[in-house]
């Protein structure tokens, strides 16, 4: 690009892309851990992992990396599985 404003936009976009990758990557990692814990069947571990995953999803939504409805849907699905596990354990 030879236009000053476009050079600046490219620079900003790259910075934001890298920042967004961090938030989405963290959210993805913790959601995976929560799913693994839920599949494992250990209730305490599953509760803790789900709590951390929900926190990360909220953070990503707050930063604008995920849409808030997307984050809400993912949290809902995790909680649904956790509640099913708790019901099964009781």
Q: What do the predicted segments below correspond to?
A:
Residues 1-90:
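Ribosome large-subunit tunnel/peptidyl-transferase-proximal elements
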